[in-house]
Structure formats: C-alpha cells, structure tokens
Amino acid sequence: MSHATQFFASAEMICKKLSHETVDRLADELTDLRERGGRLFLLGVGGSAGNCSHAVNDFRKLCGIEAYSPIDNVSELTARTNDEGWDTVFAAWLDGSRLNRNDAILIFSVGGGDAERNVSPNLLKAIDLAKKRSAKVFGIVGKDTGYTAKQGDVVVVVPQINPAWVTPLSEAFQAVVWHCLVSHPKLQKNATKW
C-alpha cells in the first residue's frame, strides 16, 4: 500500500473515530460565547500557530465572534519573549487583553502541553490564567494526556491512528474541526464566497 493510501486511510479513520458530540458541544459553547459578547483568544505554537491565525479570520468573518491571536502581533510577541520569556508570553498577552469570565481561549496543539517535560509552558500558563479568571478553556489537540485535554472545559482530541503521523494529522484536523465549527448552522452568520 502506498504512503498516500495509508495516510488518507488514517485520515478517514480519524473522521469516523473523532467525537462528533464533542465538536457539537464546542459549537454550543462558542455560540454562547458570541451571545454573551465574549471574546475568543486562539493560542498555539509551530504549525498550530499558523492555524490560529487562519482560524481567527474565519471565526470573525463567518461567525461574528470577536476573535484574536497573539500570533498575529509579531512585535508584541517577540518583545514579550525577549523581555519576559517564552513561558509567559501568552499569559502576559491575555492579561494585557484583560481576559475575563466572559471570554474563552482556544488551544490548537499537538500535545496540549506537558508540565513535567516542560513542553509548551506558555500554553500551560495561559490555561492557568484562564482558569483563574473563570474564562472557558477549549482545545483541539492530538493527545488526551496533555495539559489542555486534562484542564480544558471542552477539548476535541484527534484520535491517534498512527504514532508516526500524530503531528501532521493533529494539525490537519485542527483545520478540519475549526472549519466544521465555522460552517456549523448554530455558528455561521455569513456565507463563504465559494
């Protein structure tokens, strides 16, 4: 069997195994967020950061949700990293944005963060701040053992089909899930061009 056949067979299996109920719960939560006038802050690193930037556009344009990501402000992101450190960059940004109980953060991550291994400490501190401020914590992650999956209010976990492809399939399914959300009849307010 070719690589492409195996890869796409894994993607097909993920579509079947992924919790559709959790995706619908997340759509409900995001609808509630919009109705109460809350803001959505998207956080991620690496490929997930790129996904955050794209998703902000979709949540704003298609769903009418006030959405932001610190990834989109390179000057502030790099200044905070340089001056205060990478581990606090997202929490400091959220603090400066006056994150509050009406708001939510949405984490895009493969592993979701791991305190013991010091993986994505910036996500961990952002989650801790959100919890302290009574903001909702949402996620789309590739591991159910990470900090996001354990601490989040509603977290979509991308099923692991092949350990060699956890990263590419997790990042790909971040896009699949957020596109499902922004086209959800409860959330979508504006039509796409195509």
Segments from the language model and where they lie:
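Short beta-strand/turn micro-motifs composed of small residues
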Residues: I71, S109, G139-V141
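Glycine/threonine-rich flexible loop motifs
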Residues: G113-L123
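Surface-exposed amphipathic alpha-helices with a cationic face
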Residues: R60, L124-K131
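Generic N-terminal amphipathic, Lys/Arg-enriched alpha-helix
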Residues: M1-L18
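Short alpha-helices
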Residues: K132, V141-W194
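Glycine-rich, small/polar surface segments that engage phosphate groups of diverse ligands
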Residues: E29-A104
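Gly/Ser/Thr-rich loops at beta-strand to alpha-helix junctions
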Residues: V45-G50, G112-D114, T145
